[in-house]
């Protein structure tokens, strides 16, 4: 019977602690209901949990971006070929540009 009295005493103190935490959370601007649910489950309140989920999504998104970057690299590869074509055009432009010395042959 002594055990029963101890259990009821711990329950009262646990309730008091929960109430104190709820009051502190209200004063600090935290959502009291979320804290209460976590405390009832015996789990500590963790706000970073949502952030971790976002980080996982970001990591997956980064992987997708890497695939997109690979496509960009292929586009750049095609761009370098065009760059070589542009070099040839510059040579042709040089041929079209006549030196003023050559024009004064008259």
Swiss-Prot record:
| Residue ranges with Acidic residues bias | 40-76, 85-98
Task: Look up keyword Phosphoprotein and say if it applies.
Answer: yes
Region (Disordered) residue ranges read: 1-106
Classification via Pfam families: Prothymosin
Gene Ontology biological-process entries: apoptotic process; negative regulation of apoptotic process; positive regulation of transcription by RNA polymerase II
**Record-listed Phosphoserine modification sites:** 8
Care to name a GO molecular-function term for this sequence?
A: histone binding
How would you summarize where this protein is expressed among tissues?
A: Uniformly expressed in all embryonic cells at 4 and 8 hpf. At the 20-somite stage (18 hpf), ubiquitously expressed in the developing nervous system, in the tail bud and in the pronephric ducts. Also expressed in some placodes, including the anterior lateral line placode, otic vesicle and olfactory placode. At 27 hpf, strong expression persists in the central nervous system and the olfactory placode. Expressed strongly in the eyes and the pectoral fin buds. In the tail region, expressed in the spinal cord, in the posterior lateral line precursors, and persists in the pronephric ducts.
- State its location(s): Nucleus
Q: Which UniProt keywords apply?
A: Nucleus, Phosphoprotein
- Modified positions (Phosphothreonine) are 10
Basic and acidic residues bias spans: 1-39
| UniProt cross-references to InterPro entries, sorted A to Z | Pro/parathymosin
The text of the family note is: Belongs to the pro/parathymosin family.
Write the protein's name: Prothymosin alpha-B
- Which gene name does the record give? ptmab
């Amino acid at each position: 019977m002594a055990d029963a009295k101890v259990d009821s005493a711990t329950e009262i103190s646990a309730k008091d602690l929960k109430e104190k935490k709820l009051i502190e959370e209200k004063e600090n601007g935290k959502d009291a209901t979320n804290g209460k649910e976590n405390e009832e489950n015996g789990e500590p309140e963790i706000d970073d949990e949502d952030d971790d989920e976002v980080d996982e999504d970001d990591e997956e998104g980064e992987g997708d971006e890497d695939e997109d970057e690979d496509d960009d690299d292929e586009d750049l590869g095609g761009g370098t070929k065009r760059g070589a074509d542009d070099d040839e055009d510059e040579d042709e432009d040089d041929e079209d540009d006549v030196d003023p010395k050559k024009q004064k042959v008259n």
